[in-house]
Regions:
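NAD(P)-cofactor binding segment of oxidoreductase domains
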Residues: 1-22, 56
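Catalytic helix-loop patch of NAD(P)-dependent Rossmann-fold dehydrogenases
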Residues: 34-70, 97
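Mid/C-terminal beta-alpha module of Rossmann-like enzyme folds, strongest
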Residues: 111-113, 120-165
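A short C-terminal helix-loop "cap" of Rossmann-like NAD(P)-dependent dehydrogenase/epimerase domains
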Residues: 85-97, 154-158
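Conserved catalytic-site region of short-chain dehydrogenase/reductase
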Residues: 24-37, 43-46, 76-80
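Substrate-positioning beta->alpha
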Residues: 70, 76, 82-86, 96-118
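C-terminal amphipathic/interface module of NAD(P)-dependent oxidoreductases
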Residues: 165-202
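Structural signature of the Rossmann-like NAD(P)-dependent dehydrogenase/reductase core
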Residues: 20-23, 69-75, 132
Length: 202
C-alpha cells in the first residue's frame, strides 16, 4: 500500500500538479539499536520488511516531482489505541530492565501535527522534506510500565507476559517539528496516559 497505492494516486493525477504532497510514514525506517538519538538526517536502514516498504514509499513521495513532506510518526497511542495500557494493568506486560528506549505520540498530537504542517504549507511557509513526529520524552519501556503500576492497581505479571515492544532501541528527536512552532498537548507519556488510566479505571 505504501508504494503501489501512492504510485497509483500519482498516476491518476495524470500530470496535474499538487500544491504539496504529504506522506505519512513511521520511525520504523530507523534500525538503530544502541540507544542513540535519531533525527531526520540519521541513517535509515530498516531490517524489517515493513520498514523497508515505508522507506520505499517515502522515496516515491520525495521523487514524485511535487513539493513533498514526509512525516515519520513514532508509536501512536490514545483512547482508540490503548492495548499497551490494558496489557500492563492485566499483567500481560513485563519488560526486561533496563528495557530498550521507546518513542510515542498521542493520537491527538499526531493528528494535529499533520494538520499543523498542512496549514503551514497552505500559508506559504517552506517545509522541510522530512519531520519526525514523536513526543518530547523517549523513555525506556520498563520505566513506563513501573509508572503505570504506581498510578493504578495492576495484576502481577503472568508467566507468558510480553517482555517488550518492537526491536531496536533509539531516541527520536522532535527538534525540527518543534522549530516550526508546533506545541504538544501531551508532551510526554505521563500527560497522555494519566487521563486514559482515569477513563479505564474510573
Amino acid at each position: 500500500a505504501y508504494v503501489t497505492g501512492l504510485k497509483n494516486l500519482l498516476d491518476a493525477l495524470n500530470g496535474q500538479s499538487l500544491r504539496h504532497l504529504f506522506f505519512i510514514s513511521s520511525t520504523s525506517v530507523y534500525a538503530q539499536d544502541d540507544d542513540s538519538w535519531v533525527d531526520e538526517n540519521s541513517a535509515t536502514e530498516p531490517a524489517r520488511f515493513s520498514g523497508q516498504l515505508v522507506l520505499a514509499g517515502e522515496q516515491v513521495a520525495i521523487e514524485s516531482g511535487h513539493p513533498a513532506t514526509v512525516i515519520r510518526f513514532s508509536g501512536i497511542y490514545g483512547p482508540s489505541r490503548q492495548r499497551f495500557l490494558e496489557e500492563v494493568i492485566a499483567g500481560r506486560m513485563d519488560p526486561q530492565s533496563p528495557a530498550p528506549f521507546s518513542n510515542r505520540i498521542h493520537e491527538e498530537d499526531a493528528a494535529e501535527a499533520a494538520a499543523y504542517l498542512i496549514r503551514q504549507s497552505l500559508a506559504g511557509r517552506q517545509l522541510e522534506p522530512r519531520y519526525i513526529a514523536s513526543d518530547c520524552e523517549p523513555v525506556r519501556l520498563d520505566e513506563v510500565v513501573r509508572w503505570v503500576q504506581q498510578q493504578t492497581p495492576c495484576a502481577e505479571p503472568t508467566p507468558d507476559a510480553r517482555k517488550g515492544g518492537r526491536a531496536g532501541s533509539k531516541r527520536c528527536a522532535n527538534t525540527r517539528l518543534l522549530a516550526t512552532g508546533f506545541t504538544f498537548r501531551y508532551p510526554d507519556f505521563r500527560a497522555g496516559y494519566r487521563p486514559m488510566i482515569d477513563d479505564l479505571t474510573g
